[in-house]
């Protein structure tokens, strides 16, 4: 009789442990899903920051160019190299963009 009760106790413990393992797996799965969602949100936030940064850079590049164009349109003689060099700014902008793309790649 004791051996039957011992066997029942062992089976009950085994089933309890199996259920706990399944619950742990489910919890880990949920944590994994939450972590993936958090990573996606972080990536989205970084992409938004990079986009805003790129817009600010483009405005900084286009601002001096626009000033030169307006000055020329108003009849002033303007040496564009004293204000800006388009190739220099384009190269800088592209270098920064590439570095950000490489930084946030998967």
From Swiss-Prot:
Location(s), subcellular: Virion; Host cytoplasm
UniProt KW Transmembrane helix keyword: no
Cysteines paired by S-S bonds: none
Entry keyword set: Capsid decoration protein, Capsid protein, Host cytoplasm, Virion
InterPro entries for the chain: Vesivirus_VP2
GO cellular component: host cell cytoplasm; viral capsid, decoration
Domain notes: The N-terminus domain points away from the virion surface.
Described function: Minor structural protein that forms a portal-like structure at a unique three-fold axis of symmetry, following binding to the host receptor. The virion attaches to feline junctional adhesion molecule A (F11R). Once attached, the virion is endocytosed. Acidification of the endosome induces conformational change of capsid protein thereby injecting virus genomic RNA into host cytoplasm. The channel formed by VP2 may allow the delivery of the viral genome through the host endosomal membrane.
Family to which this protein belongs: Belongs to the vesivirus VP2 protein family.
Subunit structure: Homooligomer. The portal-like structure consists in 12 copies of VP2. Interacts with capsid protein VP1.
Additional free-text comment from the UniProt record: Translated by a ribosomal termination-reinitiation process from the bicistronic mRNA coding for VP1 and VP2.
Protein name: Minor capsid protein VP2
């Amino acid at each position: 009789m004791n051996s039957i009760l011992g066997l029942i106790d062992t089976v009950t413990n085994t089933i309890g442990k199996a259920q706990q393992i399944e619950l742990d797996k489910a919890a880990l799965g949920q944590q994994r899903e939450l972590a993936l969602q958090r990573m996606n949100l972080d990536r989205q936030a970084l992409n938004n920051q990079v986009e805003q940064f790129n817009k600010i850079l483009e405005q900084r590049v286009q601002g001096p160019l626009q000033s030169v164009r307006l000055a020329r349109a108003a009849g002033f003689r303007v040496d564009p190299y004293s204000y800006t060099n388009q190739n220099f700014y384009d190269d800088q902008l592209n270098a920064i963009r590439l570095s950000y793309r490489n930084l946030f790649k998967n």
